[in-house]
Amino acid sequence: MFEPLRKFPDFSDEQAAAWEAIAARMASHGVELEAGATTPRTEHSGPGEVIAVTGKAGSGKTVLLARLATRLAEIGLAAVTGDYEPRRRTRRSFAILAPTNKAAGVLRGHGVPATTIHRIVYTPVYDPEYQKVADWLEGERKTRPQVEGMTEAALDRAEAFYKQHGSVPGALAAAGVRGADFITGWTRRDQPLDIALVDEASMIDEARLDDLREIFGLIVLFGDPAQLAPINSQGEMVFETLPEPRRHHLARIHRQAAGNPILDLAHALGDPGLDFAAFEEMVRAAARDDDRVRIASRADAELMCTSPILVWRNKTRTRLIKAFRQAHHIADDRLVRGEPLICDGLELP
C-alpha cells in the first residue's frame, strides 16, 4: 500500500486548485493521487482527454508539473522516457514530454525524467540479439545472455553501469555497443499509454496534439499564453481552444516577488502597447537600479565564458564566436574544457 499524499504547504491557492482539478481527472482514469492507489487500465475509446494549466514564466507551472511527476512515480506508475522501454509493460504509465530536446533538458535539470514528444510517438526497433541483453538488465530474462561479439567482461561492464545509472543504452555503450547497432529503426507507437504531462505546450500544434490523443488517455498541458503561437496554428494555441472548465490559470508570479528585473523585462514584452523606445528605456532604468542588468557597448570575451549572448542573425553569431576564440587564442580545430559539445545522445550515456 502506498503512502497517502501529504499536502504541499508551499503551494499557492492557484496551484492547489489546479492540483485538485488534475487529481480529479486522473482519478476518473484510475489513478488516485490522494490515496496513492491505481486500478488496472481500461482501453480508452476515442481520443484522449485534454486539460491545461496556463501561466506566465515564474507562475509555478514547472513546480506543479514536477510535483505531479514525483507523485505518479511514488504511487507506482512507470515513467516512460526516451531511454529504453521494456517490451512487456504491466504497470500504469506516465510520460513527461516537451516539444524540443532543449525544453526536455530544462525539465531534466529539475530532476524530471522528460523526453521529447517525437520520442514517444515513435518507438525504436531493437536488434534481437541486443534485446536479450536489455531484457536481462531489466530483469525480464533470468539467465545471462550469450551474444556473438560480446565478451563476459563486456556484459560485466554493462551490468555494473546499469546498476549504477539505470540506463540500458548507456549500459550497452559501456559494453562497446553503438546506438546504431542497438536500435535498427523506428516505428509509430501502437501501444497505448496512460498519462502525459506536456511542458511548453504553446509550441504544440493541433496535429501534434492529435498524435498524443491517440496514445494517451489523459493529457495535461502546461503552457504560457504570452508566448507566440505555432506558425501553422492561425494565431491560436492548442490550450486556448479548450473550454473554460478544462483550463486552470496561474496568475501569481512567484519569482517576481523575489525581485527579478530580467523577469520584469520579459513580462513587459508581452504588452502590445510597448514600443521599442519605451522598452529600451525600461532596460536603462533596470540597469540603473539593479547590478544584475548591465548595458554594454560591445561583446566582452570574458563574460562570454559564463554568459550566453543572444543575437538576431546567424552571421553575427558566427562572427562573435570567431572573435571569442581569437581573443582566447583558441585554434579553430581545437575543443577546450567547458566548451559545449553536440553529439548523438544514443552513443553516450
Where are each of the predicted segments found?
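Pre-Walker A (Motif I) flank of P-loop NTPase domains
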Residues: 37, 41-51
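Conserved helicase motor core of P-loop NTPases
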Residues: 44-47, 79, 210, 214, ...
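Conserved P-loop NTPase motor core of helicases/translocases
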Residues: 2, 17-21, 40, 54-59, ...
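N-terminal pre-P-loop "Q-motif" helix
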Residues: 8-40
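Hydrophobic positions on the alpha1 helix immediately C-terminal to the Walker A/P-loop
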Residues: 64, 68
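Loop/turn-to-beta-strand initiation segments
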Residues: 192-195, 216-221
